[in-house]
C-alpha cells in the first residue's frame, strides 16, 4: 500500500469515494460547513493507493483506498481568534476496511501535522475511536458550531489551553469578518 500526500489530481477520486461512503447529504454536515471555501492543508492531507495486489487483492492497481484531509479553521471569542486545524473526513474504501488503513492514515497524518506544528486539531467523531490518538471532548463542551453536532463528538487534540467558551468558524468566514473590522475601523 502506498500512502502519499494528496495532489490536485486526486481530488475527483477523493470526492467520489466520499460520496460513496457518506452519501449525497455529506455537504450539509457541520464539518463540511467548516471546510467551505477552504483549501485542504498540503502535507498531512494524504491518500492511500493499492500498489501491491497481494496487499489489497480486492482492489485494482493504483486504486484509491483511502484519504484523510486537514483544513484551516478558527476559534473565535469576541475580537480574539485562534487558528485550529480540522481533521476530516477520513474515508476508507470498502475493499480496504479490514486492513487497519484508517488508523494508519490517521497516525501518519498526525505525525506530519505535528512536524508542521499545525497546533490544535479538531474533529467531529467518535471519542472511543479517536481517543487513542489523543482526542478528547474535555475542552470543547461550550464551543459552538455553524451547524448541528453532538457535544461529545466535538473532539480536540491540543497541548495548550484554549478559551472555554468560543465559536468555531470556517477560515473563510473569519477572513470576511476581519476584513470588515479593518474597513470599519
Predicted regions and their residues:
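A conserved beta-turn-beta hairpin within the catalytic core of GNAT-like acetyltransferases
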Residues: 73-87, 97
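A short beta-loop-alpha structural element at the N-terminal edge
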Residues: 2-14
Amino acid at each position: 500500500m502506498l500512502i502519499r500526500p494528496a495532489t490536485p489530481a486526486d481530488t475527483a477520486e477523493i470526492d467520489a469515494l466520499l460520496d460513496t461512503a457518506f452519501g449525497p447529504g455529506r455537504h450539509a454536515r457541520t464539518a463540511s460547513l467548516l471546510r467551505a471555501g477552504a483549501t485542504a492543508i498540503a502535507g498531512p492531507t494524504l491518500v492511500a493507493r493499492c500498489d501491491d495486489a497481494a496487499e489489497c487483492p480486492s482492489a485494482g492497481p493504483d486504486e484509491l483506498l483511502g484519504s484523510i484531509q486537514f483544513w484551516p479553521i478558527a476559534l473565535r471569542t469576541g475580537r480574539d481568534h485562534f487558528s485550529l486545524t480540522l481533521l476530516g473526513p477520513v474515508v476508507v474504501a470498502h475493499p480496504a476496511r479490514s486492513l487497519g488503513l484508517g488508523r494508519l492514515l490517521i497516525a501518519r497524518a498526525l505525525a506530519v501535522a505535528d512536524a508542521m506544528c499545525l497546533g490544535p486539531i479538531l474533529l467531529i467523531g467518535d471519542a472511543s475511536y479517536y481517543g487513542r490518538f489523543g482526542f478528547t471532548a474535555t475542552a470543547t463542551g461550550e464551543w459552538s458550531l455553524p451547524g448541528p453536532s453532538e457535544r461529545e463528538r466535538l473532539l480536540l487534540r491540543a497541548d495548550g489551553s484554549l478559551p472555554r467558551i468560543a465559536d468555531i468558524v470556517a477560515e473563510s468566514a473569519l477572513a470576511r469578518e476581519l476584513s470588515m473590522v479593518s474597513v470599519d475601523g
